[in-house]
From Swiss-Prot:
Residues 346-357 have a biased composition (Basic and acidic residues). It holds the Pfam family Zn_clus. GO terms for molecular function: DNA binding; DNA-binding transcription factor activity, RNA polymerase II-specific; zinc ion binding. Keywords: DNA-binding, Nucleus, Transcription, Transcription regulation. This is Transcription factor rglT.
Length: 421
């Protein structure tokens, strides 16, 4: 088209000279260019979803989401900007000319348009998809079901402040279909089945990486209900990966399973240690069931009551210690404790070492067979996989739980009794 060669604010050759005055405010009405990422995400060097009303990360963490105006690129102009009077003098219009005043009086007020530019979709990067095209899971659900839902007709302001868009990785080894509806254009990932074929593809490594990546992204933000629910989901994911039947069939996937699962257990334990040092009153009102929170807020010793609740929450989630039934949420009851995961992984590694099929080579290709038999009788501290599993016990010992806080069948842990990796 003929008009594509001319930028905004420039007059077309067929235009009259009187249109030059109208083009000047048109250029001023262009929306200012803002950063595609908000200030909070850019400061922490994290990926920003770029929603106008607030990115998903700031909404989850109840932070103020603001998109700063981009500075002009390139070298600054050498000459000072002309004043408004200079612009009028270029058109040979005197300041006291009544024609100029009458024309300027009819110029629309573009200040409101510039003020409302934050509501325009132009500030979003083209790489960001519509926020309503993603499924989200309600972390603020009173029942803590964390079911996937789609909200194509709801605004972002109606979503609670601790919503989370990341999937539930706990069903990594489930053979049944997903309970949620996949959005258009997305296909569910391939889940490992119970088939023990050596060629069976396994997605455990991908889910472990997603969990580690998500937990690391939560570190710069304060502890919230989203953090607690993420730890429960990561614990269920770790349990599913530990019970995977496809990873042990190959040496590389088995080694990756051991190392990444051990890393995830250490990260989960360290995150719970960080939760234990959080503000009990603020966190308790977010995490505890509403009825239990109302009862706690009526306590004469409010701070002491919430500190006791936080101690119970951490103790229940780390070592499955005693906790009030009314204070437990469904996601806390369904997720295994950190100590349960450590013990289950240790038992699995012992089974792997006792199995004659755990060697990476076939029997006819093995060398020094007597030394292989001696490997089964070595001390557990010499086995790397056992040491990786037990490294999370050192973190559990830092909580300082007393012996009466542990379940009856579990011995207490102390820094001296834990095995150093």
């Amino acid at each position: 088209m003929q008009y594509e060669a001319y930028q905004w604010g420039q007059s077309h050759p067929t235009s009259t000279s009187g249109s030059m005055l109208q083009d000047t405010p048109t250029a001023a009405s262009q929306p200012v260019k803002r950063h595609a990422a908000c200030d909070e995400c850019r400061k922490r060097k994290l990926k920003c979803s770029g929603e106008i009303s607030g990115c998903s990360r700031c909404i989850k963490q109840s932070l103020s989401c603001h998109y700063s105006v981009q500075k002009q690129m390139g070298r600054p102009p050498k000459k000072r900007l002309r004043e408004d009077n200079d612009d009028i003098s270029l058109l040979n219009i005197p300041d006291n000319d009544p024609w100029a005043n009458s024309q300027i009086a009819h110029v629309p007020d573009f200040g409101a348009a510039i003020a409302d530019v934050s509501e325009e979709p132009q500030i979003l990067s083209s790489t960001h998809l519509s926020p309503y095209s993603f499924p989200y899971r309600l972390s603020t659900d009173e029942d803590h079901r964390h079911t996937w839902q789609l909200a194509p007709n709801e605004s972002m302001s109606s979503i609670p402040a601790t919503t989370t868009p990341w999937p539930d990785f706990s069903s990594v080894s489930a053979a049944a279909p997903k309970p949620f509806i996949m959005p258009p254009g997305l296909t569910p990932p391939i889940m490992p089945s119970t088939d023990s074929s050596p060629d069976q593809e396994c997605s455990c490594l991908s889910y472990l990486y997603l969990c580690l990546s998500h937990l690391s992204s939560l570190k710069p933000f304060p502890i919230s209900q989203h953090t607690i629910c993420s730890l429960y989901i990561s614990a269920k994911t770790a349990q599913s990966v530990i019970r995977c039947q496809s990873c042990p069939n190959r040496f590389d996937t088995g080694l990756q399973n051991v190392m990444f699962t051990g890393t995830l257990l250490n990260v989960i334990a360290d995150s719970w240690l960080r939760v234990s040092r959080a503000e009990a009153c603020e966190l308790g009102n977010q995490v505890a069931p509403p009825a239990y929170a109302a009862k706690m807020n009526r306590s004469p010793d409010l701070r002491g009551a919430w500190n006791d609740y936080l101690r119970q929450l951490v103790r229940f989630s780390v070592i499955r210690g005693p906790m009030d039934i009314d204070a437990q949420t469904p996601c806390a009851q369904q997720a295994p404790s950190v100590l349960d995961l450590v013990e289950e992984m240790e038992a699995r590694q012992r089974r792997w070492h006792e199995s004659p099929d755990s060697h990476p080579l076939p029997p006819d290709q093995r060398l020094n067979i007597p030394s292989d038999q001696n490997c089964l009788n070595r001390d557990e501290q010499d086995l790397l996989c056992i040491r990786v599993a037990k490294s999370a016990r050192n973190v559990i010992a830092k909580f300082g739980f007393q012996s009466d806080e542990y379940p009856e069948s579990v011995p207490s842990l102390s820094p001296d009794s834990s095995i150093s990796p």
